[in-house]
Regions:
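Gly/Ala-rich beta-loop-alpha elbow adjacent to hydrolase catalytic centers
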Residues: 118, 122, 126
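Conserved HGGG/HGGXW glycine-rich cap/lid loop of the alpha/beta-hydrolase fold
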Residues: 34, 39-86
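Flexible "cap/lid" loop of the alpha/beta hydrolase fold
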Residues: 131, 138-171
């Protein structure tokens, strides 16, 4: 199935006061933590933006410019992705540690219940944040992300059954040569493909490999009901009209235990929706923030 190839290629490719009201305008600032680099700028109701595997915060540049005049933006980047210096410590248990680190930063800066936007792996991190730290996520916009990628292998797939495959992908990343072309189905534009390839080439293979394994083998579906009190919107890519029914069915099944989630298809887009369909993405973000 081509839809499976899209998402598996994404994995293999990287083979305020405390209310939602007015906020004092903080100075633009960047802080490097153990696992994350966080940049905060602007004022207004806070919005956290979390990119995906091997991606920088810059993947959100266009929409950040659009919404930045009305919101305090908290731009998150995993250290080791897209040119940032990797962590000097162990990278195991990366995603839970990064989520806890983000929650701690938000708490230290007296930011409660921000809107959180996460793409791909960043979508999983957003859901983990909302479950583990309810005060750190007021609403979620999940962008082309499934709660368990293993479901693409069939209804009997589990984290244990897909682990050997993703461990092979990790080994290929760590021991292989630098990629020379962007993997398929990441973007449908030459500009988007060039950006994605540059980010991938600039990423630390060890960090990306660990994040890949954790992302692919985390099954968040049993935890989705814990988000029932959270406003959740899920955007998902539909590369062509022939794939719409398949994509619709996949996302309905994936999020069936979260009936309050609003599922929104984005037509004529590959995995990086914000690069392929910036107008549709901007409209979806603005609707989410209203």
């Amino acid at each position: 199935m081509r839809l499976c190839a899209i998402i598996l290629a994404a994995l293999a490719a990287t083979a305020l006061d405390c209310s939602a009201g007015a906020h004092a305008a903080p100075a633009a600032a960047e802080v490097r933590l153990a696992h994350l680099t966080i940049t905060s700028r602007g004022s207004g109701s806070p919005v956290v933006l979390i990119p995906g595997l091997a991606s920088p915060a810059a993947v959100f540049d266009d929409v950040a410019t659009r919404i930045g005049k009305d919101h305090r933006l908290i731009l998150v980047q995993v250290n080791g992705f897209a040119g940032t210096r990797p962590s000097s410590g162990p990278v195991d248990n990366l995603l839970p540690a990064a989520v806890d680190e983000l929650a701690g930063w938000l708490d230290a800066n007296h930011i409660e219940k921000p809107a959180v936007i996460g793409h791909s792996m960043g979508g999983l991190m957003a859901m983990m944040l909302a479950k583990s730290h309810p005060e750190a996520a007021g609403r979620l916009l999940i962008v082309d992300s499934l709660p368990f990628y293993g479901m693409l292998f069939g209804s009997s797939a589990t984290p244990d059954t897909i682990r050997p495959l993703v461990e092979q992908m990790r080994a290929g990343l760590v021991n292989g040569t630098s990629p020379v072309q962007v993997p398929p189905h990441m973007s449908n534009t030459d500009t988007g493909k060039a950006k994605i390839l540059a980010w991938l080439k600039a990423s630390d293979p060890k960090t990306v490999g660990e994040a890949l394994v954790e992302d692919a083998t985390t099954d968040f579906r049993p935890d989705l009901p814990a988000l029932s009190a959270v406003r959740v919107t899920v955007l998902y890519a539909v590369p062509n009209p022939e794939m719409k029914a398949m994509a619709d069915a996949l996302y309905r099944e994936a999020y069936k235990s979260l009936p309050n989630a609003k599922l929104v298809p984005v037509s004529n887009s590959e995995h990086f929706i914000m690069l392929d369909q910036p107008a549709q993405f901007d409209e979806a973000v603005e609707a989410f923030l209203r």
